[in-house]
């Protein structure tokens, strides 16, 4: 089943995105193709929404595939944040910059992910090791709370 997404994947198009995600989740076919071919722009909100839909589709037993955006810049951005790998396509293809962190499923606290987040936060800001340690503890606490309060079995 092909689910064709709109040109703009943003919080302003949330209703359309939610409808498309529900369409994918409701599919009775094993293969669900997220067709992003006409998409030209995405914001982090849309990526989070799509990632949640992908995870739910995989959990329901769907095989998720992508029709990648025709816009090269958007395609490269999705690849660079691990979006395709998150959905099971192109594993290991992500190429992260110092301003990005990988889109990832959590089952517990991961110190390497905390270091990636700190790398992004500290990329343009000089801070003492003491402040960095405090920030590390805050990020760990935030990730722990998010997982503990998500009521998710995974």
Model-derived regions: residue spans:
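Short beta-strand/loop segment at the start of cytosolic alpha/beta domains
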Residues: 1-4
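A contiguous, low-structure linker/loop signature
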Residues: 72-108
